[in-house]
Amino acid sequence: MKKLSLLLLLSVFIFCGCSDDDDTKTYILSLPNYETHTLDMGDQENPDDSWSVSSEWGTTNYKYNLLTDASGIFEFDCVSSTYGFYSDSFAFTNCTVEDCPDFASYDYRAITKKGVINNTYVIVGAAGYKIGKNSDKEAAIRFRDHDNPNELEDYRVKGLYVTNSVYAYSSMKEGTGYYGEEEIFGSNDSFKLTIYNYDKTMHVDCYLAEGTNLLDQWKWVDLTSLGETKGLKFSLTSTKKNEYG
């Protein structure tokens, strides 16, 4: 069962890299332009890693891929399972219409139905279940050294745009078939995204919903206060909780 905590982000992501000689370069996330509607979770036939987990409900198969943008600097963990996109990872998509084919039962599309610059954007699930074979990874973006991709590099992040997914927005506004009106937000409810620097010593909060005011546009989040960091980590909290969180 998915939590409410699923959002869409990173249609545009701007950050600066500073070298020892103060030669500052600015990088902007550069995502693929897909010719057809796509939910890109990496090479599903030849994943970087795979494993299975057995429970009383049966066996779930997992696949792990690393996704990078055109610059090779932004690195995203992508985990998919027997049931599709996993709850704590990233994927690329350009789905912008109501009837995008081949999506899993949950609606991962941006409520805006488009990106900020082009129609490709990044989705992230940050439900708090952890990812990876050893359950030791958080939903995080890592920054690779432009000259040495085997190493992480500190960058000053300017910010990024975020918005709600169709699923999160609809559940807050109308409820879903699982819990009905219990999920509908009232005046005292909130849905908050927290973005940390890589070692989680600093953070920035951004509200995706405050009361019945639900975010339905791309919203710029200033991250300059995080200083230099080797990546970003994400968590989501909501006043609406159930037995799954």
Model-identified regions with their sequence ranges:
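Extended extracellular/luminal ectodomain segments enriched in beta-structured repeat modules
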Residues: 152-159, 228-229
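C-terminal motif of bacterial Sec signal peptides marking the signal peptidase cleavage site
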Residues: 14-17
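Terminal, low-complexity interaction segments
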Residues: 190-245
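Short edge beta-strand/loop segments characteristic of extracellular beta-sandwich folds
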Residues: 161-163
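Short coil-to-beta strand junction motifs in C2/discoidin
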Residues: 171-193
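N-terminal targeting leaders for non-cytosolic proteins
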Residues: 24-144, 152
